[in-house]
Amino acid sequence: MFEFLINKLKAHPRKIVFTEGTDPRILEASARLLSGTFLTPVLVGNADEITKAAEEAGFNIRGAEIMDPANFADMDKMVALMVELRKGKMTEEQCRKSLSQANYFGTMLVKMGYADALLGGATYSTADTVRPALQIIKTKPGSKIVSSCFIMVRPSATGENEVLAMADCAINIKPTEDELVEIAVETARTAKVFGIDPKVAFLSYSTLGSGKGEDVDKMRNACEKAKAAMPDVPVDGEFQFDAAVSPVVAKTKHITSSVGGHANTFIFPDINAGNIGYKICQRMGNFDAYGPILQGLNAPINDLSRGCNALEVYSMAIITAGLVD
């Protein structure tokens, strides 16, 4: 998967903002990215502090761009644009104060074209990363919500790695039918970015009517709407998980679609199922989990775990930049 994304970035090099410019994990990942020449880190913070932190840690970040909100040349222009974007919800003084914060400043760098994408959250909360994105980058045309997916990769020593997409595992707590449709559409698009030919399964405790109830109806109805929304993508359900992934079970349950037994893109009914599901896959199925990958925004903005390591930062940077249209 990463070879696929790196080749894409080599053909079209990108710039990615890191909001925590002095963090050792960010600096280590930046040094590694710079050695590949396909992705330029844009580090937010004081240049002297960032340079000193890199030197003390032994990381070569020559070639990285450093942007400091304290002496940014186009700050007045940035403030004016943010006032316009907030449409009376924030005064000029409030915008200027917000832009002294790395997350707002970094998000505006993406908005103004100084960078293509942003990765934050190594020391900030998810809300600190997502809130500026919603206020400044906003949802793209046709999207009403921001959702998330995880890309799950199981390494193989003998052939191609197994790659799956799972959603929504982190953002929408109890999505409606229409929100599930949007989540499915966006997740199928994300899957394609990572080289997955999506076969989308709507998951439930029921397989094609074997169970009854409002929750089953919601997944079945959402599935039918998703089929209409993306007629060129195989979509089916509602399925129990085993019917979605096991050809034997799918045959036993008389599922004839190309999705049954062969699904690789999974839509969960709610965040409980999604979060539990991807973590079972990660911990007991020996899959590597990459995400949450935010979907539905006008530009790629992603959130790191505060417990991340430098390799995870490096990987998520490639993933985030790979999402740039």
Predicted regions, residues:
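Anion-binding alpha/beta catalytic cores of soluble intermediary-metabolism enzymes, centered on
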Residues: 1-260, 265-325
